[in-house]
C-alpha cells in the first residue's frame, strides 16, 4: 500500500469519527453500486475489493475504463466540477467489496477545512487517469490475445503482490469476469489462459493468477 493511500484511508476514518456522516456499505460481486444517470449524491472510498467502472453506450456496448483497487476514491465528478451532476459511469463490484461513503456536500466542506485531503485525493485520481489510459490502450487491440495480456499486466501493476514464482494478482478472477472486463467471451478467455499456462507464462491457483515474468508476458504478442 502506498503512503498516500494510507493517508487517505486514515483521513476518512478521522472524518468518520467526527461530524462527518460516514456510511459503510457492502456489495457482492456483480452488484451495481451506481448506474449512469443516477444523481451524484455520495463520494466513495473503496476499503476492500475491486470496483469496475465502465461506460455504457446506446448500442448496449459496455467498455471498461478502470478497475479500482483498495483505497481508491470514486464518484467525485461533482467535486471536480463544483456543480451537481449525474453519474457518468456504471460502477459494479468486480469482487465482493466494502466501501466508505460520504454525502457530497459534507465532503465539499471537508475539502475546504482540510486542504491536505484534496492533495491526497488528487494523487489518487492521477493514478486512476493513468490506468484509464492503459485500459483504453488495452481495448484498442483487435487481437484478443493481446488484449488479455495487456489486461493481465495492468492487474500486475495495480493488484500484484511479489511471490516466489513471480507476481501474483491479488484478486479471485473468474474467466467470465475477465471476459466482461476486456470485451470478450468466457470461452475465448478460457482458451487464451490455457495457452498462456501451456507456455509456462502464468499459473492459476484458486482463481488467482501468477505471472512468472511480466516482461516475457509482455513480449508474447508484441
From Swiss-Prot:
Required for full expression of proteins subject to ammonium repression. Transcriptional activator of genes subject to nitrogen control. Keywords: Activator, DNA-binding, Transcription, Transcription regulation. NCBIfam families: NtcA_cyano. It comes from the Bacteria. The lineage of its organism: Bacteria, Bacillati, Cyanobacteriota, Cyanophyceae, Synechococcales. Residues 175-194 bind DNA. One of its GO terms (molecular function) is DNA-binding transcription factor activity. The gene is ntcA. SMART domains: cNMP (SM00100), HTH_CRP (SM00419). This is Global nitrogen regulator. Residues 142-215 form the HTH crp-type domain. GO terms for cellular component: cytosol. It comes from Synechococcus elongatus (strain ATCC 33912 / PCC 7942 / FACHB-805) (Anacystis nidulans R2). A nucleoside 3',5'-cyclic phosphate binds at residues 6-128.
